[in-house]
Amino acid sequence: MLSEQTAASGSSSSSRGADDREIVISTGREIVVRSSGGEEREEEVVVEEELEEPEFRDIHALSPPPTPTPSQPSSSYHRRRRESWESAAGSRHTSIRSVGSDTAPSELFPTMSREFSAMVAAAANANAAAAAAANGGDSSRAGVDDALGRIGEDELEETNPLAIVPDSNPIPSPRRAHLALPAPGDVSSAGGGHGDEVSVGQVKKEEVESKIAAWQIAEVAKVNNRFKREEVVINGWEGDQVEKANAWLKKYERKLEEKRAKAMEKAQNEVAKARRKAEEKRASAEAKRGTKVARVLELANFMRAVGRAPSKRSFF
C-alpha cells in the first residue's frame, strides 16, 4: 500500500534523473541497482511498512427520549421511541461496520445490545434529573422512572414462593363468618385505626391457622406414609410365614402319604399271609378228618362182619 506507492514514485523520479538506475521492488524491501563509471552496485533499502492502527470509536449516551404529553397517546409515543432506538442501533452498527471494514475480522468491535443502550439512556436521564433537581421539575423524575421501567430495574421480584400474602378481597368462609363480621356496637364505637388493628390481627391469626393446618396435613401425611410402609412390611412377613407353613404341611403330608402307603402295603401282605396259613391249616384239618372218618367206617365194617358189638371204650 503506502510503501508500494512511495516505491513507485521513487522509481518514476529516479528514472528521469541524471544517473541511470534500475529499481526492483519486492515485498517489504527495495533493491536499487546503480551504474556509475561502468561499475554496477546493488543497494538494498528496507522499506518498513506502516502498521495500520485500528480506529476506536467512543460510545456516547443516546439523547434522552421526549416525555409524552397529554395530547399524545402512550402507544404512539412508545412506537416512536422504539423506532428511534432501532434507527440509533442501525446507525451505530453501520458506523462500526465502516470502521472495521479495513481491519481484520478478528478486530471487529462487538455490537451493543438494546438493553445496554437502554441502560446508557437511563444513566443519561438520571444525570439530567440530578442537574435539574434544583428546579424541582417532576417531568425529569417521570422520565427517569420511565427509563428505569424500560430496563426493569425498579421491578421487585418475589424471592420466597411460599410466602403467605393476605388477599385484598378474601372470600368469607362459613367457619370464619362470625370473625369477619363484627357486632354493630363495636363498629359504632371503634375508629379507623382500631379497625386497621383488628384487620392486621385477623390476618395474623389466619396466617397462624393456615400454618397450623399445613403442619397438620404434613404430619398426617407422614404418619400415613409410615403406616403404609409398615403395612407393606407386615404383609410381606405374613406372606412369608404362610408360605413356610404351607410348605411344611405339604412336606408332612407327603411323608404321611409315604407312611400310609407303606402301612397299607404291609397290612395287605399280612392279610395275604394269614389267609395263606389259614388255607394250609384248613387243608390239613380236612385231611385229618377224612382219615379218621375212613378208619371209623373200616372198623364198623369189620365189626359187622365179625358180629361182635363194639365195646364201650372208644378208639378215639
Swiss-Prot record:
Biased composition (Low complexity): 125-135
Feature: compositional bias, Polar residues: 92-104
Inducing or repressing factors: Induced by abscisic acid (ABA).
Location in the cell: Cell membrane
One GO CC annotation: plasma membrane
This protein's UniProt keywords: Abscisic acid signaling pathway, Cell membrane, Coiled coil, Membrane
One GO BP: negative regulation of brassinosteroid mediated signaling pathway
A molecular-function term among this protein's GO annotations: signaling receptor inhibitor activity
Tissue-by-tissue expression: Expressed in roots, leaf blades and leaf sheaths. Expressed at low levels in stems and spikelets.
Domain of life the protein comes from: Eukaryota
InterPro entries registered for this protein in UniProt: Remorin_C
Membrane topology: Peripheral membrane protein
Main location per the UniProt record: membrane
Note: Plants over-expressing REM4.1 are dwarf, with dark-green, short and wide flat leaf blades, short panicles, spikelets and grains, narrow bending angle of the lamina joint, and short leaf epidermis cells.
Function recorded in the entry: Functions in abscisic acid (ABA) signaling downstream of BZIP23. Acts as antagonistic and negative regulator of brassinosteroid (BR) signaling. Binds to BAK1 and inhibits its interaction with the BR receptor BRI1. Inhibits the formation and subsequent activation of the BRI1-BAK1 receptor complex.
Protein name per Swiss-Prot or TrEMBL: Remorin 4.1
